[in-house]
Design a protein with these regions (language model features):
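Alpha-helical transmembrane segments of multi-pass inner-membrane proteins
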Residues: 1-13, 26-33, 76, 102-114, ...
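Membrane-interface anchor segments at the N-terminal boundary of transmembrane helices
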Residues: 2-23, 60-75, 373-390
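Membrane-interface helix caps and helix-loop-helix hairpins in membrane proteins
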Residues: 13-16, 58-62, 115-124, 235-236, ...
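A membrane-periplasm/extracellular boundary helix in multi-pass inner-membrane enzymes
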Residues: 15, 169-175, 232, 236, ...
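Membrane-interface micro-motifs in multi-pass membrane enzymes
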Residues: 16-20, 62-71, 124-128, 188-203, ...
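N-terminal hydrophobic segments of proteins, predominantly signal-anchor/transmembrane helices
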Residues: 32-125, 423
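Membrane helix-loop boundary segments at the extracytoplasmic
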Residues: 47, 53-57, 371-378, 411-451
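Long extracytoplasmic/lumenal interhelical loops at the membrane interface
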Residues: 178, 187, 307-322, 326, ...
């Protein structure tokens, strides 16, 4: 019977050129996989995410990252059907404060659909958040009760990202590794270089940790090769925000390594903030007088990060932020609706802030911030929920790290925390939670942190 159905479906696909039906065998395989070994399917989604592509220029344009997002949506539907059948919820996860913040944030996103300037756009945006969070946080979080799942999430993503990096470097080499071509050579796996750099930075702490753990000589060479590959890929991504985020992650690692207490950390932060406040005029003069623009020269490229007078990328970012703040001032409490910024910000631009890369169209990106974007789209509560989410991720993770026994799990929690540091520091300048490449990393590591938060002990090894 199955053979007849498959043959019939193939005939329809070929005869009527209905290409979507070609997904039927793949969908059947995924459904079978979900019923018989859900945990490995979740890991397969993690592994396939860096290699998924968006088919925008083809007749089969669904606006999704394939096959990752289709699989995530299918897993969400599977979870819903399973709940209707079994009536069971993952109460250990639901009872955690981190989970409750995530659900309340989702609830606020859903509530603001009622006031959205583009309700259908906001509904789709909320729906995509749901199909990222349910498989990667709730389902994968449940699967992490098994040690082998916890151990494989980062290597599965990192090695697949390594394949994408080899492709990217190969294409990039044909253009002399120039800065100009670095923005698109990672296509079709990553839309542009900032997203690619974010992913590289997120898994980079894991690649360092993998070098130092006890392992065979063969695996040590494999991990060394991956580390070197990711390092080269990071350098030639020309992503300044990714480089900055790794500096921040390194500083946080030193806090753990040197066992700096919360009181000492607060004192350091107060001294640093006071120093910046007292010297703000000098810093502004440095920023405004810096005319170094991004280029192939790595030294100049790093210096250009503080150029707010002539660097087009920096000025456009300031233009997007200013537009977002004006949108928030216009609708301070409920915002314009999730996912609407790129379609609504154009009238809020000022001619004096426009750059040669500015646009009035809706296809050129978002607010370039995980903080200011929610402010414009969801009102001031949107920013509050982001701050609460970050706070609970790190509060849960730091508490778990201190409680877990030294060993594999403790190291994984540290890697997850450092990955989160890279993301949220990068999030000052870009935002990717609405895309599978970023969402899978953030929510799978949050699931690991949540597991550690409710776990009593770690595994030595």
């Amino acid at each position: 019977v199955a053979g007849v159905i498959l043959a019939g479906a193939t005939a329809v696909v070929v005869g009527f050129e209905i290409h979507a039906l070609a997904l039927i065998p793949f969908a059947a395989l995924v459904v079978f996989w979900a019923f018989y070994h859900l945990d490995s399917l979740l890991l397969a989604v993690v592994a396939i995410t860096p290699l998924s592509v968006v088919l925008k220029e083809s007749d089969f344009n669904v606006g999704l990252s394939l096959p990752a997002e289709v699989m995530l949506a299918g897993l969400t539907l599977f979870a819903f059907i399973r709940f209707l059948h079994q009536g069971r919820l993952p109460w250990p996860i639901l009872n955690q404060a981190l989970t409750q913040v995530i659900l309340l944030q989702l609830g606020w996103m859903a509530f603001t659909i009622l006031f959205s300037e583009m309700p259908l756009v906001s509904f789709k945006a909320v729906l995509s958040r749901v199909w990222f969070i349910i498989p990667m946080y709730f389902m994968l979080g449940t699967a992490m009760e098994q040690p082998w799942v916890r151990k494989l999430i980062f290597p599965f993503y990192a090695f697949s990202l390594g394949i994408a990096a080899i492709w990217t470097l190969s294409v990039h080499s044909q253009y002399g590794f120039s800065k100009e071509t670095s923005t698109w050579v990672m296509f079709p796996f990553y839309k542009e270089h900032t997203m690619y750099g974010m992913a590289l930075a997120f898994v980079y702490p894991w690649s360092i940790g993998a070098l130092w753990r006890s392992q065979s000589l063969v695996w040590r060479f494999i991990h060394l090769g991956l580390f070197l590959l990711l390092t080269v890929a990071l350098v030639f991504s020309y992503t300044r925000a990714a480089w900055l985020s790794l500096v921040a992650a390194g500083a946080v690692y030193l806090v753990f390594a040197w066992r700096i207490s919360a009181r000492q950390l607060l004192l350091i932060a107060l001294v640093a903030a006071s120093s910046l406040w007292l010297t703000q005029d000098q810093w502004m003069r440095i920023f405004t007088k810096n005319d170094t623009v991004s280029s192939d020269n790595f030294s100049e490229h790093i210096q250009s990060a503080s150029n707010i007078s002539s660097d087009a990328s920096n000025l456009e970012r300031l233009n997007r932020w200013a537009s977002a703040l004006r949108m928030w001032q216009d609708r301070p409490h409920v915002g314009w609706g999730l996912g609407t910024y790129q379609f609504q910000y154009a009238p809020f631009q000022k001619s004096s802030q426009l750059t040669f890369i500015s646009t009035n169209g809706g296809g050129m990106g978002n607010a370039h911030s995980e903080y200011i974007g929610p402010l414009a789209e969801l009102g001031w509560p949107g920013l509050v929920w982001v701050v609460l989410l970050i706070t609970m991720i790190f509060r849960t993770g730091v508490g778990a790290y201190r409680r877990l026994a030294p060993g594999t799990d403790r190291s994984l929690v540290l890697v997850a925390l450092l990955g989160q540091v890279t993301y949220w520091v990068h999030g000052l300048l870009n935002n990717f939670l609405d895309l599978d490449k970023g969402a899978v990393l953030v929510w799978m590591s949050a699931a690991l942190i949540a597991w550690a938060g409710r776990s009593g002990a770690g595994i030595r090894g």
